[in-house]
């Protein structure tokens, strides 16, 4: 169900609840956190034609996330890479929100109630209306 705005909003809400040291890390690497919030969806934005970049994003949505996060955290620890950690924190937000919402979205799409992408876009539209786009500043700029 979540798409661009929902993932961004969720990441900002998560950020507010993080301990101060994690907020500081995200402020230092805010762009990477925000990119991570979109997970593999960011690969869908290259829409010149049917292409391997978009296909890779689709495939990532069907893969188990555990191996991705384990390898990412191995790299964080091995290289003391806080920039990668900020990205993984954002990607983790993406994964959590998708995991919570996609069972419902997939059910509605399978039953022919509403196409997957239409439901996601409508959810974003409703969130924008409900928040009146109050969340205009970036999570990394808050505090």
Language-model segments: residues:
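Short active-site segment of divalent metal-dependent hydrolases/proteases
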Residues: 93, 97, 101
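Conserved small/polar residues in nucleotide/adenosyl-binding loops
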Residues: 135-143
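Short alpha-helix carrying the canonical HExxH Zn2+-binding catalytic motif
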Residues: 85-93
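N-terminal, motif-rich segments that launch catalysis or mediate targeting to/interaction with membranes
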Residues: 1-86, 104-134
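Alpha-helical and His/Cys-centered functional microenvironments
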Residues: 11, 98, 140
């Amino acid at each position: 169900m979540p798409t661009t705005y929902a993932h961004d909003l969720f990441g900002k809400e998560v950020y507010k609840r993080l301990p101060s040291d994690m907020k500081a890390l995200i402020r230092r690497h805010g762009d990477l956190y925000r990119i991570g919030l979109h997970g593999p969806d960011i690969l869908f934005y290259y829409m010149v034609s049917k292409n391997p970049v978009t296909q890779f994003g689709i495939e990532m949505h069907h893969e188990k996330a555990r191996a991705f996060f384990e390898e990412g955290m191995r790299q964080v620890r091995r290289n003391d890479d806080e920039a990668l950690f900020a990205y993984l924190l954002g990607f983790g937000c993406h994964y959590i929100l998708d995991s919570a919402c996609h069972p419902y979205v997939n059910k509605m799409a399978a039953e022919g109630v509403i196409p997957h992408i239409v439901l996601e876009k409508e959810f974003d539209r409703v969130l924008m209306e409900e928040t009146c786009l109050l969340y205009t500043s970036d999570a990394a700029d808050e505090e």
